[in-house]
Every structure is written in structure tokens, then in C-alpha cells.
Amino acid sequence: MPQQLETTEHKIAGSESDASFVKPLRVLMIAPSLDMLGGQSRQCARLREQLQQEPTLEVAFLPVNPRLPGVLRKLQAIKYVRTVVTTLFYWAALLLKAHKYDVLHIFSASYYSYMLSAMPAVLVGKAYGKKTILNYRSGEAEDHLQNWRTALPTIRMADVIVVPSGYLVELFARFDLRARAIFNIVELDRFSFRERRPLRPVFLTSRLLEPLYNVGCVLRAFALIQKRFPEASLTVAGEGFLRAELEDLARELHLRHTTFIGGVAFDKMPQMYDSADIYLTATDLDNMPSSIVECLAAGLPVVTTDAGGIPYIVTHEETCLMIPRNDHNRMAEAAIRLLEDQELASRIAHSAREHCRKFSWATVQSEWLNLYQSQAHENAEEHRYREDGSRKNAVGVE
């Protein structure tokens, strides 16, 4: 459903008797909509869908990338102009809506995304006296915190910092920032586990076509794989400004059976995973990529680099095969190893499926609910303290 400028609200209706005793906690989730494919938008959509079933919550959504109304939408097709007008409309909606909620749950990446989307939400939340949860999700956190002057002082203004992995907890601690880890969620029932016997040389990669994700390394590895398995195929799912350059590289490498299919909608990814037999990712820097966990759930063996937080979520030879960054030779060797040792591939796939249960909603649910309720309780205590202070001051004046 299209995301409009106004927030999309969903009040959870409990029984009339419940409503008379318990006032739902009002939470505003602030993140990119699914118009902007990526980890933030997908995680927000998943979390929102689950939280909207909780009778103790009233959840609303404010997209940081609103679709503008009427003729103004044409401005969003103009490079640079779209950033200005979209940001201004988001800021206006933020100012108009944020005061209605008890807790602002703010999804955040790094750099300009943080400065234009998350930072204003933290500042507005503080101005309105609301509790703010900064859900920071970027694998580029170290460079962001170290080199952007606005980052540390404004991140410290958030009441709670939540990150999706122990990797970022440790990284934030180096900057004297206290963060807590709550895993990304994966709805296991969306992914059908498929036993891949025999394991075919049918490969998939599905990262953004940008330098950070080093899809060129995957293509170079695949060139070596095709020398051993000439019938091997590779599907490259994802968009990005490097697409033309990567397509040129595929031609230079004389790759066969290699298809660039562009971005894939969130609800189509289970079919993509099911169509492949091995997943390749060569990212140079990452946090907790949901794509890897989704592969585990689907029984799709993964060959991944050891970048960033990835070793915090999977283990070499237990739930994946892990290689050093930017090493296409090692990636090809690992993929060929799976194809030539199908017992290893099967063992990894089954172990990975069990491992990924820790990322299910049943595991993560209580952590989010307890966090929301603790923030609401603190807000109530602070409000009561201010009221008591006002009464004492009034008595003193009399």
C-alpha cells in the first residue's frame, strides 16, 4: 500500500474491558518505507506488522521518504530536488505528528541519512519531551561516529540506543556510547526449508550494487566457478549506481548464464531464495545482514566474507562458509567445496536452520515490549516528579 505523507496508524483493538483498564502505549516508528528497498525498511515493516498485533500498543508509522501529494510528486523524479522536497515534507510531518506519541522508535543509518532523517527525529523527540529509541543499523558506524561532528552529541541525546548485533554494541562502547543488542527478526514461516539434493551450481547474490557490497568480487569468483562447472548460473538481484559497471565486468569476464534482474520486492524474496542452491555475498563492511539469516531459514547454503558483524551471527563450517574480504579466489574455492562435498552443504543447511530460530519474533518479542514499557514507565515517573516539584513550588510561593 502506498506510503502517504501522513502517518499510517493502526490501533490494536482489545476487548472493551481491556480498553477500560489499560491505555495502549503510543509508539511512532520512523523509518524508510518499502518504496526504498533496504534493511531498514524491511526490518521496520516486519517489526511493525508484529507489534500491531500487541493489544498493549498503538503503533503508527512515519516514513522518512513520504510520497508527495498530487503534482508535487513529479518533483521527486528530479535528482537533488527530490532530496530537498522529500526531506522538508518529512520534517513538517515529524513536527506535526511526534507530539501525539509516548515513544519515538527511530530507525537510523549513517552519514547524510542520519543527519536528514534520524537526527531531526531525536531532536524533535527531546523538544516534545518524548522518549526516543535510536535503532542504529549501519555497518559504517565507526567511520560515522569518528568523522562526523554532529553524530556523537546527538546520538547521546537518545534515551536508548538499540543495535542489531553484539558487533555494534562493542563498537559503540569504544565511543563511550551504551547500546543494547536486539536481533533483526526473520519470520521463519515465510521461508520454506528446501533440502537441496543434489546441490546444483545455481547461485544467487542480492546486495545493493554499490562499492560497499563488492559485487565485483562475486562476479570474479563466479568466473572461476564456471571453469569448474560450465553450466553454473548466477542471478544478481539488486539495484545501485554500479549496475552498468558490473554488467560490463560480467561481459569482460565472459560470464555465461548470468542475469541482472534489478531490485526484488520484499515479498518476492522467499521465491528468489528457493530458486537458488548457493548464496554468495562479498560485502566489505556490514552489520547484521538480514539476507544471510533469511538464507539460513530457507536452507540456502551461504558463502560470505567475514566483514563487520557477520561473524557475530554465523560461524564458519557450522552455519556457513566464511572467507576473508575481497578474496574472489577463496570465495570460488568455498563454493566449489560445497558442490563437491554435499554432505557438508547439507549439514551446514540443517544447522543453520536451527540456528536462525534465535532471530524469530517469538525470541525477540519480549525484548521490544519490555523496552517500550520501561521507557513509558520512566516517562511517567519523570512527569510525576515534575508535577510534584510544581506543587512544592506553588506551596512555597503561597
Predicted feature descriptions by range:
Residues 301-304, 314:
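Short hydrophobic beta-strand element within catalytic cores of glycosyltransferases
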Residues 263-264, 271-276:
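Short alpha-helical donor nucleotide-sugar binding micro-motif in glycosyltransferases
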Residues 26-30, 195-226, 235, 239:
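Conserved donor-binding/catalytic core segment of Leloir-type glycosyltransferases
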Residues 284:
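Aromatic "clamp/platform" in nucleotide-sugar-dependent glycosyltransferases that forms part
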Residues 155-192:
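Donor nucleotide-sugar binding/catalytic pocket of nucleotide-sugar-dependent glycosyltransferases
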Residues 316-317, 321-328, 337-342:
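Conserved acidic donor-binding segment of nucleotide-sugar-dependent glycosyltransferases
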Residues 330, 337, 344-358, 367-370:
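A short, well-ordered alpha-helix in the C-terminal region of glycosyltransferases
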